[in-house]
């Protein structure tokens, strides 16, 4: 990882060559600002005011739930904290330049930029299988996954998933006209575990071509062990199923748990039968910057994925990512520790104060809680509410001469689930927005996903509001 700042290297890494010498003030001051910001203590008790800034998490909650205020947006997976100071400083300097045309990623700076990513992964995660020759840049993990799917999972083939799992994968599956091959995990002693017999049975189906692994697992919070990943990989290798490892949440590991990169496994054949996707977007809350990458030790998989990877790089995203690596590691370490404590706080609070919500063991990874809302759904009659909403939509569609479809793409015509009703109820009664569990596949029924990457004060306010709302219906 780079520890200092080199003006020429910075310009090269931006891919704009000597024509950007007007960025001299940026280059001259970035090292100082990065070092200064890295030295200061991070403040996660003070969050950005995201309302009024078109935030999906906050403004989206107001718009979608038709409420006039929100105590906490706890849905989509981004963080409420102010960005690492090193990132903000770099971007402020970068926008002093007055032209945002195409950049030439064929310049020598591209190698320096890739090296900074490789160095970070070597140092922080011990991923020695990664190098500048077997990785490539893309705009996001989804874009990378779609590129691999285009090469290895033809329309109609099956995609193996251990569920509940990140709902975005289902969008990728629909986009590629493939089919989800779901293996429901077991919930044992408050912990989700793969049902290995079922997983292998699904992997052995002849039309199962790929398996998307989420490591750590969103939304259930498992940080997979070396033994679990090895078994996962060996089953997939045995049945000629390519592993697509989404490790975007890898930095958010709770105290006492460990992130094991799939590419670090001892079995070289298992590793070669995989491709890994990573990004700065979760670690440093840079989802809007569109900067990610993938790597694999398999030359064939690399070439095929690169061939289908039609994603360009966001210039500011590159500046932000480089600044994060140069001066953001301390901030990130503090952030991870703060979120681990948030998990403890949330688990303890819910167990003591919200008996209508059940939680399992503390999540080992991610900044997401997977909560059981069965009691709430039963109490508010969520199933009947969903049935009524679906019938009303069907009747309205019939009057318009339109076929009713749960996949119509129109909010008023989408099939509603009991979990959707709990989501709406929570928004209107506690003014807290959560994600409905059914969108995460098999095992999502009676569950909600809750994002705790916010200040302790906001987290407590949200839980207080949820406790008060559920208390009113608990009698």
Which sequence ranges carry the predicted segments?
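N-terminal small-domain helix-loop-helix segment of the aminotransferase-like
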Residues: 39-140, 326, 473
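PLP-dependent aminotransferase class I/II
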Residues: 273-352, 356-364
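Conserved glycine-rich beta-strand-loop-beta hairpin in the small C-terminal domain of fold type I
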Residues: 339-347, 359-376, 386, 393, ...
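PLP-dependent enzyme catalytic core of the Aspartate aminotransferase-like
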Residues: 385-475
